[in-house]
Amino acid sequence: MPTVHVFARDHINTDEIIPARHLTTDVESELAKYAMEDYDKDFVRRVQPGDIIVAGADFGCGSSREHAVWALRGAGVSAVIAPNFARIYYRNSINNGFLALECEGITELFQDGEEAELDLKGGTIRNPRTGKELSFVPVPQFALDVQKAGGWLEYMKAGEDVEGERLDNASTSAGHGHAGTPLGDDPAKEDGPRPEQASGHQKEEHHA
């Protein structure tokens, strides 16, 4: 089970998540070295892959910087759970396939260092030590798909690959016509689109 790191204060800003003096790189592994440095210098030594941050309201406020998401993800954090998030930070989290879960009363459910049982499909988080459980705002399927893909760009690329494969299959099927009816024996009875029609449709799909 993941360990919970509690940062109970409200309005933790992006400069505390990753100080501006370290914004000289976009490499997550480098940014990770300084995650939460101005709030808790020992955080990066304690955090393990899959751990969770529990925070106060308006997490990620302040200046807009995707580095604030990259630093936590690079450090191994799997999710941040807070009553609510700064709008831009929340959007950046979704775009980068990082979980930002909204849950009222979350800072009262855990003490720092406790373990958590997180059920994304069920929309619950539980403290196994106390047996107490809270529900969080359900994660939209779209956001889960983006998270599974690893971010918005990866999600879009995967969609393009699937669409390209679908079009290739459709083009191949059209080229063979119906089973038992060789294409070209009787042009008037051809079922598949003419090559120029298929090509034009494919180009149009790629431009959409």
Swiss-Prot record:
Gene3D superfamilies referenced in this protein's UniProt entry, alphabetically: Aconitase, domain 4 (3.20.19.10)
Broad enzyme group: lyase
Pfam family membership, one: Aconitase_C
Keyword entries, A-Z: Amino-acid biosynthesis, Branched-chain amino acid biosynthesis, Leucine biosynthesis, Lyase
SUPFAM superfamilies, per database record: LeuD/IlvD-like (SSF52016)
GO molecular function, one term: 3-isopropylmalate dehydratase activity
Keyword check for Transmembrane helix: no
Catalytic activity: (2R,3S)-3-isopropylmalate = (2S)-2-isopropylmalate
Entry EC number(s): 4.2.1.33
GO process terms (BP): L-leucine biosynthetic process
Self-association and partners: Heterodimer of LeuC and LeuD.
PANTHER family: 3-ISOPROPYLMALATE DEHYDRATASE SMALL SUBUNIT 1 (PTHR43345:SF2), 3-ISOPROPYLMALATE DEHYDRATASE SMALL SUBUNIT 2-RELATED-RELATED (PTHR43345)
Protein name: 3-isopropylmalate dehydratase small subunit 2
Gene of this entry: leuD2
